[in-house]
Amino acid sequence: MPRSQRNDNFIDKTFTVVADILLKILPTTGREKEAFAYYRDGMSAQAEGEYAEALQNYYEAMRLEVDAYDRSYILYNIGLIHTSNGEHAKALEYYYQAIERNPSLPQALNNIAVIYHYRGEQAIEEGNSEAAEILFDQAASYWKQAIRLAPTSYIEAQNWLKLTGRI
């Protein structure tokens, strides 16, 4: 039984009902509907911390989905899972792929910046201030892009950019 049919979460159930109605009204192919069902099940599994199941659903959605914009969100969510698992290099790969398909995805740009900032802090802890500065500059570059797309978001990043003289 698909996850969407066994979900007890009210919000997820509501989303599922609305999505099913939209899929019936809008002109979509069977393949698009199937891709969306896998994506929806992936989001549900991810929300419950079932990352292996979420990844399986996202990979199936990627196999079926042809629209670059829709694929960007699937890739972004795969990146989130890898970030949650501490697999930052893998997460970066997926975030880069997401923004390649959808350059207007500020949350992916933000997450890339967060990873570079984290790596910069690690470099400081290791006593490598030169590497830290390079990593912080990379973080700043991605945060500036994210802020350009979503000016009222990422307030903490905006403050950090001002504090460090990078804005």
UniProtKB/Swiss-Prot annotation:
SMART domains per UniProt: TPR
Subcellular location per the Swiss-Prot or TrEMBL entry: Plastid, Chloroplast thylakoid membrane
Family: Belongs to the Ycf3 family.
Role of this protein: Essential for the assembly of the photosystem I (PSI) complex. May act as a chaperone-like factor to guide the assembly of the PSI subunits.
Entry-linked Gene3D superfamilies: Tetratricopeptide repeat domain
Protein name listed in UniProt: Photosystem I assembly protein Ycf3
Lineage of origin: Eukaryota, Viridiplantae, Streptophyta, Chlorokybophyceae, Chlorokybales
InterPro entries per record: PSI_Ycf3_assembly, TPR-like_helical_dom_sf, TPR_rpt
Keywords for this protein: Chloroplast, Membrane, Photosynthesis, Plastid, Repeat, Thylakoid, TPR repeat
Organism name: Chlorokybus atmophyticus
Chain positions of TPR repeats: 35-68, 72-105, 120-153
